[in-house]
Amino acid sequence: MIDDNIENNEQTINDIAEEIVETANPEVTALKAEIEELKDKLIRTTAEIDNTRKRLEKARDEAKDYAIATFAKELLNVSDNLSRALAHKPANSDVEVTNIIAGVQMTKDELDKVFHKHHIEEIKPEIGSMFDYNLHNAIAQIEHPDHAPNSIITLMQSGYKIRDRLLRPATVQVVKKP
């Protein structure tokens, strides 16, 4: 009888425990679902913040790299003029002219150093190299039996780029098909 009583009490306790779990289970399930939803939102928000930070860093770096592009474009003509002056120096000249030419050369060299410091590269295609519309601007087509079609026959003006962005295309003449 005592054993039966104990069994009945244990059964009653188990029934009560199951009833409590069944009553609490929807609440626990709802809370677990809410926790999972909040974890998911946290992960997504963290990823979004990280992506935004990366985009801002990239934009900042690009702005820093390309901020001088407009100014550099204006200096390209200065570089061209210095090069033209050096290309037309007289063969026989007195000391004063020689000193002036040396000064022009030093100025050109210094400008080239500044260009290099700011990742500004000259685009100077070789004669015979193939025309690339991304880097070159063809102003004329000339028939020439010794060169392949679409190859560069004359460099009219050097081009320039800053890192991977084109500042000015190289102006060229290309060979056309006969």
Curated annotation (Swiss-Prot):
InterPro entries noted in UniProt: GrpE, GrpE_coiled_coil, GrpE_head
The UniProt record lists the keyword Heme: no
Alphabetical list of Pfam families matching this protein: GrpE
GO BP term, pick one: protein folding
Molecular function (Gene Ontology), one example: protein-folding chaperone binding
Keyword field: Chaperone, Cytoplasm, Stress response
Keyword Cytoplasm: yes
Location relative to the cell: Cytoplasm
Disulfide bonds: none
GO CC, one annotated term: cytoplasm
Source domain of life: Bacteria
Known role: Participates actively in the response to hyperosmotic and heat shock by preventing the aggregation of stress-denatured proteins, in association with DnaK and GrpE. It is the nucleotide exchange factor for DnaK and may function as a thermosensor. Unfolded proteins bind initially to DnaJ; upon interaction with the DnaJ-bound protein, DnaK hydrolyzes its bound ATP, resulting in the formation of a stable complex. GrpE releases ADP from DnaK; ATP binding to DnaK triggers the release of the substrate protein, thus completing the reaction cycle.
Subunit structure: Homodimer.
PANTHER family: GRPE PROTEIN, GRPE PROTEIN HOMOLOG, MITOCHONDRIAL
Similarity-based family: Belongs to the GrpE family.
Name under which the protein is recorded: Protein GrpE
